[in-house]
A protein has these predicted regions:
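Catalytic-core regions of glycoside hydrolase
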Residues: 1-194, 199-232
């Protein structure tokens, strides 16, 4: 506190990935959580993750605008901001609350090439148009780092681009910035990558898993309970 001052943002995720809400007054619980944060700092902002059933609508309704910041945790796969194509679609998104367009990308620290370039770009600009009053930035929410840096470069550049662009256009600039030269061979390689391994067409929990990491079985489909060993690119 002496070095950094009093914190402004406080994270709390009640009933995350389960937890029984039976008999719980969710509105009252939400208010109590925020009140505890306000005792530490009267300007405190509650940061909450949007994942599965969270944040509960009753809590969203009970908290005043400006007191909560929602992380749309996996905007590239299961957004809740109001994308009708999402399996976790919410018609009103997060209502009056500010939120961040986040990319989860990595699950469980698995290492491998993976991304959804088109989905990340299209989703961001659709969200900015539909929720321009509450969308206030982007976030990275990965469970592992030191892989797929191109995807983070792409995501973090989005807020700086007022006009929508294509991944093909962006990749050309990325190649020049990454290698410090304009080489047609490098552009070709990265265009191939952006159309295949970095443009996954479906929802999945990160990179393709190796069957050698799975438990022995006659048929192996994944190494983890959430992943997939099915290739999505040629």
């Amino acid at each position: 506190k002496e070095l950094m001052g009093t914190s402004l943002y406080y994270s709390m995720d009640p009933f995350h990935e389960g937890g029984s809400t039976e008999g719980v007054d969710l509105a009252a619980a939400g208010k109590s959580i925020l009140e505890a944060m306000k005792r530490a700092n009267s300007s405190a902002v509650w940061v909450i993750q949007a994942w599965q059933a969270n944040p509960r609508p009753q809590i969203l309704d009970a908290i005043e605008a400006g007191d909560m910041l929602v992380l749309d945790l996996s905007s590239e796969n299961r957004p809740m901001w109001g994308d009708k194509e999402s399996p976790w679609y919410r018609e009103n998104g997060y209502g009056k609350h500010d939120w961040l367009y986040c990319m989860l990308l990595n699950f469980g620290g698995n290492v491998g090439m993976y991304g959804r370039m088109d989905r990340v770009i299209d989703g961001f600009y659709a969200a900015r148009e539909l929720r321009k009053g509450t969308l206030c930035g982007v976030g990275i929410t990965m469970e592992g780092i030191e892989n797929n840096p191109v995807m983070y470069e792409l995501l973090l550049e989005l807020p700086w681009r007022p006009e929508k662009f294509t991944k093909e256009e962006w990749v050309e600039g990325y190649v020049k910035a990454r290698y410090g030269c304009d080489d047609s061979r490098l552009r070709q390689v990265w265009q191939i990558l952006s159309e295949t391994v970095y443009n996954c067409p479906d929802i999945r929990e990160g990179t393709v898993e190796s069957v050698f990491c799975a438990r022995p079985a006659e048929e192996v489909h994944s190494a983890s309970s959430w992943g997939s060993s099915r290739m999505y690119y040629p």
